UniProtKB/Swiss-Prot annotation:
Organism: Akkermansia muciniphila (strain ATCC BAA-835 / DSM 22959 / JCM 33894 / BCRC 81048 / CCUG 64013 / CIP 107961 / Muc)
Family: Belongs to the YbaB/EbfC family.
Subcellular location: Cytoplasm, Nucleoid
Annotated signal peptide: none
Protein name per UniProt: Nucleoid-associated protein Amuc_1227
Function: Binds to DNA and alters its conformation. May be involved in regulation of gene expression, nucleoid organization and DNA protection.
Subunit record text: Homodimer.
Main location: cytoplasm
Pfam family, one: YbaB_DNA_bd
Length: 104
């Protein structure tokens, strides 16, 4: 294979990965907890963008319940975003397993 052709393909892949990362930074996923009374929205690059808590699940005498519910729902949103990002990157790389930090 021609080295120049290979270099051009690598540059095209890098451009595609950069575009995908930019897209994923603005693409959001939402998870719910407590039967929809808690909603967490995050970008696919792991930033929380919205947190909605129905006042009916706030019990000042049981803050542990709300804390645990928040952690579970936030972690679920982050995991969902990572799964979405990984699937998108896999499309671009043709299923190549890239080293950490080279994909998304």
């Amino acid at each position: 294979m021609n080295i120049m052709k290979m270099m051009k393909q690598v540059q095209q892949m890098q451009a595609g990965l950069a575009a995908a990362q930019e897209k994923l930074a603005s693409q959001t996923v939402t998870t719910e907890g407590a039967g929809g009374k808690l909603k967490v929205t995050a970008t696919c690059d792991g930033n929380l963008t919205e947190l909605v808590i129905d006042p009916s699940i706030i019990d000042p005498s049981d803050s542990e319940f709300l804390q645990e519910l928040l952690l579970q729902t936030i972690n679920a949103a982050i995991a969902k975003g990572k799964e979405t990002a990984a699937a998108e990157m896999k499309k671009l790389t043709g299923g190549l397993d890239l080293p950490p930090g080279m994909g998304f």
